[in-house]
Amino acid sequence: MNIEVNFCHNMEHFGAFEENPKLAIAVSGGTDSLALMLLVKHWNEKVKGEITVLTIDHHLRSESTSEADYVSSICQNIKLQHVTLHWIHKGITGNIQAQARKARYHLLTNYCQEHDILHLITGHHADDIVENFFIRLLRGAGLAGLSSHNIFFVNNVRIIRPLFNITKQDLKKYLEQQNIKWINDPSNNSNKYLRTQVRDLLKSMLISFQNNFTVELLKKRIMLSQMHLTRALDSVNNEIIHYVVYAVKIYSAGFAVIDRKLFRQASPEARYAILSYLLMIVGANTKPQRFSSLQHIILHDIQEYNTYKTLHGCIVEYSIQYIIIYREFGRCYPRSKVVSNSVVWDYRFKVVDNRKNNRMNLTIDYLKKSDYHLIKSYVESNQRNAYFNYSRKILFTFPVIKHLEKVIAIPHIKYYSDKTIQESVSFVFEPKLISRWFHYC
């Protein structure tokens, strides 16, 4: 099949677009993204959308700025709008590729949000999918990790990957036909990165298979397996939604409660997924916990009560009826912050400050045990408060408002020693992980 026809068919796979859609394409100047840009331009002749090409200058190599300029020159020649976004940093240590990827999505999706662009199209081709499968397999990934989705949301921006069944070799041939030169990133061939090591491993595997396997056949087999895994994952996702609705409550005060009896009726895969999501939401994490740790929590649930475990920045407490998950500060308590609009405390609570006249200096902090005696009588007279039905310890994870080191408000339990604060300052629970599956009580 002609690559342009194949690409247009793939775009139809993602469903109908709105009339004259606003589209962004992530283009680095490499084979994949340049071919993607030309294919989107061809497809757009019928759709009549507004295209913006976005290039990230990571400032990690001396050539990065000239490479962004090269993409800009091509866009000028084919009459596409181009914008270069800059990753400003003070030198990177640790996992450079992971940090660069995180920065890319942050910059790209922020630009899309600021310019009312819903669709961000990225170059993620068949070879990438095969390599990702093996990388995740080596890391012991579960069903969700081994399956592959070509459409998902980041920061409320719709990420589309339409090259999922097109190989890198086909993309190179297409660019040669269009007489477009591409940029070779030397890091793609560096053996210090796991992706390059996996690529070499696949080549050696094919050599050992001799004539029984070809590269294309291997890719097709793996993509077929991923289709089956994705279909199985969709089924599990439906189960997850069911048990999130009936067995889970997430409170806007930043903790979660699971009905143990109902939760045990779910499949192990659904339970692992739900626990993983809850630990990320409550613990202010962006990455899931390892399977082995979650397995320990699941086994503990079968036989224990009136005990607790610590995991992923959370305390997992077991009562006879419930599993209660709340924040564990450990040795790293969140810093106090001055109350003002849009300030985020503990990476989870955003401040809404509607004060107009009385602007006394207020701070957000956690409740210390030494502060508790000031509100003890209020707490004891409000035993029916739903939060206190689970664990009194949860109280010490709530954000409190202080003036001159004195607690004057704990909005989540409706405690106010100053009534003007009740009408003007509040908290909104906004964890790092946001999922359409979860709502807050």
Curated annotation (Swiss-Prot):
Subcellular location, principal: cytoplasm
GO CC annotation: cytoplasm
Keywords from the named record: ATP-binding, Cytoplasm, Ligase, Nucleotide-binding, tRNA processing
Subcellular location: Cytoplasm
Catalyzed chemical reaction(s): cytidine(34) in tRNA(Ile2) + L-lysine + ATP = lysidine(34) in tRNA(Ile2) + AMP + diphosphate + H(+)
Coiled coil: none
Stretches that traverse the bilayer: none
Binding residues annotated for ATP, in chain numbering: 28-33
A Gene Ontology biological process term: tRNA modification
Superkingdom, natural source: Bacteria
EC numbers for this chain: 6.3.4.19
Name of one Pfam family that matches: ATP_bind_3
GO molecular function: ATP binding; tRNA(Ile)-lysidine synthase activity
NCBIfam families: lysidine_TilS_N
Family: Belongs to the tRNA(Ile)-lysidine synthase family.
PANTHER family documented for this protein: TRNA(ILE)-LYSIDINE SYNTHASE-RELATED
Entry's free-text remark on domains: The N-terminal region contains the highly conserved SGGXDS motif, predicted to be a P-loop motif involved in ATP binding.
Its job: Ligates lysine onto the cytidine present at position 34 of the AUA codon-specific tRNA(Ile) that contains the anticodon CAU, in an ATP-dependent manner. Cytidine is converted to lysidine, thus changing the amino acid specificity of the tRNA from methionine to isoleucine.
Protein name: tRNA(Ile)-lysidine synthase
Name of the encoding gene: tilS
